[in-house]
Amino acid sequence: MNVIEANGLGKRYGSTWALRDCTLAIPDGHVVALVGPNGAGKTTLLNLAVGLTAPSTGTVTVLGDTRPGSRTALDGIAFVAQDTPLYKNLSIADMLHLTRNLNRYFDQGYAEARLGELGIPSTRKAGKLSGGQQAQLALTLALARRPRLLVLDEPMSSLDPLARHDFMATVMTAIADDGVSVVLSSHVLAELERVADYFVLLSSGSVQVAGEVDDLLACHRVLTGPASEADRCADRLRVVHTRRGEAQAHLLIRTNGSADPVPQGWEAHPVTLEELTLAYLREPGASSLPGPVRARHTEPMDVAK
């Protein structure tokens, strides 16, 4: 089963398309990294999935329900937004009471126990908590709904490294204990590489890359060799992106999983998720979806890298 399916999905604001012709299937039981530059459509896609806005074109199905935002669909979803929406003037106890009354599957015992472990007193107002504590409170309220799908829209953007680590530790515990599927939008590639096993890259409102992380890494490599031979080598390969220096060039290539021979005088290296992401971000015309790589670009190499 897929937790999210989009078919020709689009959202237009006036004459501007925030998301266009988005077709995507996100399988159950995964931690999904949703990546893209600012304005790529990440938040729009997530808002469509949780029913906060309606599509202009196409359809989106969430947990088998074709009506995002309906009571049955929302029963299985928990959403934590970037701005950590909380009632800042309410105490923690009042927040728990309110959330319990609004959600029929809310696990009060879990929420109280989790906040106790975090050392967050029930008498304190939400607005008096630190940024990390507010993020943990929002996450606790979301997980206490016992969702099948947890949607996180850059919830760690304002957190320090320790708070981000603690936040993700809570998420990973929920995955291990309850089998929650997670869709996580973030710009912090290093964190995503540690936790994600499925990857989606949006560019200009459309899906550019999608697939299992292991499969994507297996069918991409970095070739390093003489800069003078880069063009000749690239003509025989599916090159996504080239970085060229005075002496050496680095070609990120797609192999489609085949054991393509390494050209003479070149060395092959495994690719990291960060390298793959940056290469495709620099090549809006290239795609790892079915079909050929559609663009190749040469960029001067930063010798400090």
Q: What are these language model-derived features?
A:
Residues 35-37:
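The feature captures the beta-strand-to-loop junction immediately N-terminal to the Walker
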Residues 50:
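Helix-to-loop junction immediately C-terminal to a conserved catalytic motif
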Residues 81-137:
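ABC-family P-loop ATPase nucleotide-binding domains
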Residues 150-154, 159:
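Catalytic Walker B motif of ABC-type/P-loop ATPase nucleotide-binding domains
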Residues 166-254:
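ABC transporter nucleotide-binding domain
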